Amino acid sequence: MLRKIAFGLAATAMMSSAQAQEVVLKVAHFLPPMSTMHSRFIVPWCDKIEAESKGRMKCQIYPAMQLGGTPPQLLSQVRDGVADIVWTISGYTPGRFPISEVFELPFMTTTHEASARAVWDFIDEHAASEFEGVKRIANWVVGPYVIHLRDKDLKTIEDFRGMKIRAPSRLGNRMLTALGATPVGMPVPQISESLSRGVIDAAIVPWEVVPATKAHELTKFHVEVSGGRSLTTATSIYVMNQKRYDSLPPELKKVIDDNSGREVSAWVAAEFKVGDEGGRAAALGRGNKITEIPADEVKRWKDASQPVVDEWIAEVTSKGHDGRKLYERAVELVEKHSRN
């Protein structure tokens, strides 16, 4: 009898152990598996949490919107539990991140890692409430945005006139308008078709997106700005459903916690830097022309886009915040981490 009881307890323990291993996190995003985010961060991150949980926690990754919907719906999908974790661009849901979008203002960010650390710290200080319902794993900005043009080069601010250019966000729209272009908003997956059909004359995206969108095959000219500041950028968020996180046992929560935060944000930003180098090389490999805008012309662009900054400060202030103080703090954090 005692042997039967012992056997039963052992079987129950084995069943409990097996059940404990069945934590499978659904991770969704909007780019194909060849993209930098998928291959250089999401897959390694998932491998890391699986190893650190000793196989008790794994990921099932759904790239290219395989769970359905469109990129702007990813944030709702993770909040509603359709996905457990998502990567998305905050600018795809205008108005939901009014404070943290400060980093998308013209000529705000510098290097990949420094900007990522600044974004994480700023959100900790001033914008954590924008992430209600989700657990932040990483916040960063993608690399410097480059203008990729179909048929003609762009060298001065006057060349923007009459051009239809894909913009990354509402602040990107405003910047392009200030420079004289006609902005066309769309998620990254729509860029290829829009370029090939002539819906847009150019697209603003970082270099790392180029291979996944075939932008180097659909354009002939690429424009970078000198001076170490990004023309504009997009704030990226890698977040987990809060209830799903709360349901984990303490030891698995610790695995997620150990793989979240400022330095994880810097890690993914560094991978985007590698991706940028690869995208730039792909364009050069096709014989495309890369133009760097000199400092005196960049100053003209910066002066022309200053009203975008002023308008953002006024908008945020009208909602009860100190817009000037928030802007200055974001600048301060970027400069602080750029010095380190």
Regions found by a protein language model. Give the residues of each.
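Sec/Tat signal peptide C-region and signal peptidase I cleavage site
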Residues: 16-20
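Bacterial N-terminal signal peptides
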Residues: 4-14
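Intrinsically disordered, low-complexity segments
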Residues: 14-15, 51
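Signature of the catalytic double-stranded beta-helix
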Residues: 117-125, 129-130
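N-terminal secretory/targeting leader peptides
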Residues: 21-114, 129-340
